[in-house]
């Protein structure tokens, strides 16, 4: 790799990547799981001893005796401390001879469900929410706060906004239905330069029973763009739904996200056939993350049609925290008016991955009240109590009224920030929650009923 940027030169560099695939049943998480378990060190002073320790650890893991593990970098103290954070299970050291603060690259600390004799036992998990190393002890809460504070000034994790806001609920079950049924509805997935969620989106739609097709938008030359417009307009004529996936279309430039997508959909031919899909053929549209940004800029949410926007329209802007956020959040269903949410109930809580720098929903109070009354506020970010919140730990972008997703007036166009397509077996095993809100299955059923 080499190159330059302005006055900065990058010397020729070799970068190596390595992966170690394993069966999903062998996957371990780092959080301590239960009180009364022995905690062991698998390490060696020579390469041969280290390899033997790894083999012994692997054998125990495959036998189901390892319930959590940590690859040591900066010492045993760091390992047991961070292992304790997830479930606030304490640790008491039993081996004080070890150097708890010396780097130990290659070593593994593991929580075992059974006793073993061929590894070094270093301690035991405890009910007390503290880490005890001999006579020294500190609470997990204190240690976690100190750990978070190290880079808080550089990479803040909190903002001043906190507390609850109104949790909207709209109980109507009235939904639109298509005049023509489809056993296997076709879903068109436009892929723009910078889109990066098309494969997850296609997989989710296909598994739900849709005929999901990616459409690559080419923009290398003006002729490529014209050809893409013509072919996309033709493809829309035979589609039942359009799903705009997430990513960073056009690198989120110039000056904001989704402008490339917006310009493409405002083309007269594309606009005509998208309008026909929605207004004449009862079709559906979904925009996730970057796709949601495009739907808002086009007016498709909350107004249900492509239109010229002005300063009174809602928008999605930069996260309050001032940086990109990537994490799992909880969302609360506020309305089931949309066919996309037919598999949910008002008040249901779903955990969803988010990854964006511009996800803060802003709208006037008057518009929000109108959307709430119409049942167009589909989902809100929620805290552990199940209610909407402005706390940055749960509302990652500072969206007004904690709004995560909204719909068109009839619910057939849905935009949301959370990546509901990024779910599947063996994912997020260390974060409890309900992940599948049946978004794509509900869309397919809409055309079958």
Where would I find each of the regions flagged by the language model?
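Intein/HINT protein-splicing elements and their conserved insertion hotspots or analogous self-processing inserts
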Residues: 2-104, 113-186, 194, 203
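A generic local secondary-structure boundary/capping motif
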Residues: 3-7, 27-31, 98-99, 176-179, ...
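Hydrophobic alpha-helical bundle architecture
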Residues: 68, 94-104, 111-113, 220, ...
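Conserved phosphate/anionic-ligand binding catalytic regions in large, soluble enzymes, centered on
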Residues: 68-82, 194-198, 248, 257, ...
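Active-site glycine-rich loop that binds ribose-phosphate moieties when present
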Residues: 52-54, 269-270, 307-319, 324, ...
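N-terminal beta1-alpha1 cap of cysteine-dependent amidohydrolase-like domains
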Residues: 134-288, 292-303, 308, 317-325, ...
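C-terminal and late-domain segments of enzyme folds
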Residues: 328, 333-449
């Amino acid at each position: 790799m080499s190159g330059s940027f302005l006055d900065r030169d990058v010397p020729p560099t070799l970068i190596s990547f390595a992966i170690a695939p394993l069966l999903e049943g062998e996957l371990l998480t780092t959080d301590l799981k239960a009180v009364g378990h022995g905690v062991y060190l698998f390490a060696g002073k020579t390469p041969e001893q280290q390899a033997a320790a790894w083999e012994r650890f692997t054998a125990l893991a495959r036998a189901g005796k390892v319930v959590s593990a940590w690859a040591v970098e900066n010492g045993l103290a760091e390992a047991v401390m961070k292992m304790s954070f997830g479930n606030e299970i304490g640790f008491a050291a039993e081996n004080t001879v070890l150097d708890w603060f010396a780097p130990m690259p290659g070593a593994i600390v593991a929580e075992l469900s059974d006793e073993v004799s061929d590894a070094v036992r270093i301690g035991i998990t405890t009910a007390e929410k503290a880490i005890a190393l001999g006579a020294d002890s500190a609470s997990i809460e204190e240690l976690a706060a100190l750990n978070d504070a190290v880079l808080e000034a550089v990479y803040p994790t909190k903002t001043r906004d906190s507390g609850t806001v109104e949790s909207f609920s709209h109980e109507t079950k009235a939904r639109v239905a298509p005049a023509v049924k489809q056993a296997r509805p076709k879903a068109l997935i436009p892929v723009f330069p910078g889109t990066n969620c098309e494969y997850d989106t296609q997989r989710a739609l296909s598994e739900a029973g849709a005929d999901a097709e990616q459409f690559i938008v080419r923009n290398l030359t003006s002729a490529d763009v014209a050809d893409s417009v013509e072919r996309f307009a033709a493809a829309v004529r035979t589609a039942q739904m359009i799903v705009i996936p997430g990513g960073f279309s056009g690198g989120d430039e110039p000056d904001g996200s989704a402008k490339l997508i917006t310009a493409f959909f405002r083309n007269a031919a594309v606009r005509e056939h998208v309008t026909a899909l929605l207004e004449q053929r009862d079709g559906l549209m979904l925009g996730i993350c970057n796709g949601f940004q495009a739907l808002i800029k086009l007016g498709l949410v909350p107004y249900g049609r492509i239109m010229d926007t002005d300063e009174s329209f809602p928008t999605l802007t930069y996260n309050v925290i001032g940086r990109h956020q990537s994490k799992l959040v909880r969302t609360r269903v506020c309305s089931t008016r949309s066919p996309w949410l037919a598999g949910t109930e008002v008040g249901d809580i779903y955990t969803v991955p988010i990854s964006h720098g511009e996800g803060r929903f802003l709208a006037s109070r008057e518009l929000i009240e109108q959307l709430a009354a119409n049942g167009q506020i589909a989902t809100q970010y929620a805290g552990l109590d199940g209610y909407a919140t402005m706390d940055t730990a749960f509302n990652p972008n500072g969206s007004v009224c904690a709004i995560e997703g909204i719909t068109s007036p009839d619910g057939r166009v849905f935009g949301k920030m959370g990546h509901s397509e990024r779910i599947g077996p063996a994912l997020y095993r260390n974060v409890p929650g309900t992940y599948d809100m049946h978004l794509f299955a509900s869309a397919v059923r809409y055309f079958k009923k």
